[in-house]
């Protein structure tokens, strides 16, 4: 399913028909997966662990250290978040765990903006361009829930005359 919230309906229909089911790269929520186990249904999920993906994203940023990240000198990492689909559990986990990794590294964070980019490069480019116009040099980190949106963010950052990792 495109939206994780529809997994229960799909699972019920497929199980009623007696067909095994594999969800690929769209992880249903934990309650739904627990339901499969409780009912001993032939249903599974195959894909990446979005919690881990978010954690890795945050850890890569945290490795830079607060001295490099805190360009405006307020003692915090000021960031914007460009999310995928808000109903998608992967987007929710990537959003939560990327920021949590910075906090776990002892960094104080400050969310300047959070927008939904719907996994789309052009939409993310527009959202980041608007955020840069609104928040200027205060934006120190741009989180994106997928690579397409990250490419859009990069284009917006470059168009604003900034260089990733430098300013």
What are the functions of these language-model segments?
Residues 1-167:
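A residue-level marker of the well-folded mature domains of exported/periplasmic proteins
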């Amino acid at each position: 399913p495109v939206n994780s919230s529809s997994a229960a309906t799909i699972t019920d229909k497929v199980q009623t028909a007696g067909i095994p089911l594999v969800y690929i790269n769209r992880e249903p929520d934990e309650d739904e997966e627990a339901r499969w186990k409780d009912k001993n249904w032939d249903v599974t999920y195959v894909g990446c662990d979005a919690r881990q993906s978010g954690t890795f994203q945050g850890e890569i940023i945290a490795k830079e250290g607060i001295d490099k990240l805190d360009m405006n000198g307020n003692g915090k990492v000021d960031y914007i978040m460009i999310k995928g689909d808000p109903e998608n559990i992967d987007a929710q986990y990537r959003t939560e765990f990327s920021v949590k990794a910075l906090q776990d590294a002892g960094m104080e964070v400050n969310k300047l903006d959070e927008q939904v980019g719907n996994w789309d490069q052009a939409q993310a480019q527009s959202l980041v361009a608007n955020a840069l116009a609104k928040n200027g040099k205060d934006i120190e980190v741009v989180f994106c829930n997928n690579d397409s949106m990250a490419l859009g963010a990069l284009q917006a950052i470059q168009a604003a005359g900034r260089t990733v990792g430098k300013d």
